[in-house]
Amino acid sequence: ALAAIPEPDDGDLFFDFEGDPLYTEGQGRWWGLDYLFGWVDADGKFDALWAHSFAEERTALERFIAFVLARRAQHPAMHIYHYAPYETSHLAAMAARYGVCEAEVDGLLRDGVFVDLYPIVRRALRVGSRSYSIKMLEPLYMGEDSRTDMAVTKGDQSIEVYLSWRTAVAEGREHDAAEILQGIADYNEYDCVSTLKL
């Protein structure tokens, strides 16, 4: 199973989305917004794109794909690691939704640039838990750097916290809104670093 993991490359990225599945606009033509595209590089440097509307999500998708293509031109052997199929299925769905970057996303998928670590872990490890959630595996490799002191610790909680950000913005509580977004960013960064360390 471990032979499925490509050789490391300086261009490798470790990627994670945060999303709100209940977000919609107007008449509800579309549902679900991936509001945070987050990644770390092989050195653990975090970067992110935010999207708080469908228009911003489209822009974030275009910017992310442009970034990946430029990085791949510099690092042809790079891969983008993620855990479970959410990231790749949502990138493809976004590209189809907006009619942008479809060929580019398809090419990255066909070329095997994205590497889902979940099936590799399922085949390679036997753990004392029914769940192979990355959060259940983290005690094996994250050491003392745990999620317990973070404002956001679980995916479903991040959705609730994101909704509280929208409320804070609507009520004009800018300081609270900034703190809430930082908590979500910290959670996403931890997920990306966890994927890197895994």
Q: What are the roles of these predicted feature ranges?
A:
Residues 1-26, 70:
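Long, highly charged low-complexity segments
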